[in-house]
Amino acid sequence: MSTTTAILCAFGVYLLLMIGIGVWCMKKTTGADDYFLGGRGLSGPVAALSAQASDMSGWLLMGLPGSVYALGTGQAWIAVGLGLGTIANWLIIAKPLRAYTIVANNSMTLPEFFGNRYHDKKKILLGISSVIIVVFFLVYTASALASGGKLFNTVFGIDYHVALFIGAAVILIYTFMGGFLAVCTTDFVQGTLMLIALLVVPIVAWGFVSGDFSALLTQSGVNSEHYMSLMYNGDHPITPIEIISNLAWGLGYCGMPHILIRFMAIKNEKELRKSSVIAIVWVIISLTLAVAIGVIGRAYLLPAILGETAGAPSAESVFIQMIQETFTNKINLPFIGGIFICGILAAIMSTADSQLLVCSSAVSADIYQDIFKPEATDKEVLNVGRITTIVVAALAFIIAWNPNSSVMALVSDAWAGLGSAFGPLVVMSLFWKRTNLPGAIAGLLSGALTVIIWDYIPLIGGQTPYVATGLYSLVVGFIISLLFIIVVSLITKAPEESIVEEFETYKAYKEQ
């Protein structure tokens, strides 16, 4: 069996497994609550790994190792920020959010929770938050599909557009059939595969590295002291603003609907405690090993870097090249190498399917049912959700059609937009009973608009504020949104007594 055939077989087994899970979960999905929230029946391990797998995307196995490979360990600050954000999200947000969404009329989605939390009879919060989700997640889904297309193209030489279609079709099939349960179950498998790949590949590759490591780094064309220092970005000292901006990525977690929905869907408090431990351990190990892959790759792939062998690695393909070099050239186990490359595909798919489902729920449950047709039956909402899944996937496919499109550059803006719009509002909704509807609307709009202005409007000497200052828009957007929520809530009418009573009920329920 040729190397390419062996890797193709590994991909085929993996993709068929994902579709099989979708078929199995379809039999368990009977209504909208099952399709969008899994009937609030997620176990701890499934909730933990599905949340983390859907969060990290291909960035964990391509973007982070690639940036460390190119510029050194100073790129690890973003991993530190994401690790701290994950820990805070599970320990501070998860339990209260699950409790409040149950008390607030068993809310199935984040926009629905906001509407129920503030008794928004005019559906203003619901409409604004749903539109924000659809816009940002459409771009997110497109970027994930594009990553999958590029992966197939890199590994097999398949035409990008054919590869894009294959990846999109598989994700659409199991998401369409099984909904949230299929997404979480496949994400559990994918999260496990990602962790195994991260554990095995760098350890095996390290066994083939010989010689003084610092000398190998120097031969590869970098200053070894700068490369291994957290205080350098390449050969340039890292600035405080760069550190703050990278750490600030962690702020986004409390505003990510595709992660927060896992908290809402966990079966009970016991499973929540279990999932918190699993998720935190997973993210610490995974981020650490992803950084290690970039560093080890610099020495391990030295012959290719120096041109002594064919195929000098590009930054983002360092993990792929490490797998191929180890399991094809060194120990001749191409099928196993193919399974580990599937770990990269798993990272991409686990994010795309979650984003697809969040868009679907925003349109069918939050916009169609809650705003336009409150009398819609459960079956009707389920059918609209499935149709929306197809439409959103098709739109994302169109956006991702150009392999050289700038959609990937928009991912950080989407993270900032969602984190700034939803993050402060989630926190204040859970922990400050004085927050009212005007404050919530002000926070939602100010957070999203600040990110757009900061990243796209040339206000400072013909430059955008981001270009002029280098400060990540999430930092500014989060702070401004938080201030708007507090100030507007204090200068407008206090929440109705029924809202305050519901808040007290939630507090009591949370402590049970």
Question: What name fits each language-model region?
Answer:
Residues 1-512:
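Membrane-embedded helix-loop-helix hairpins and adjacent transmembrane boundary segments
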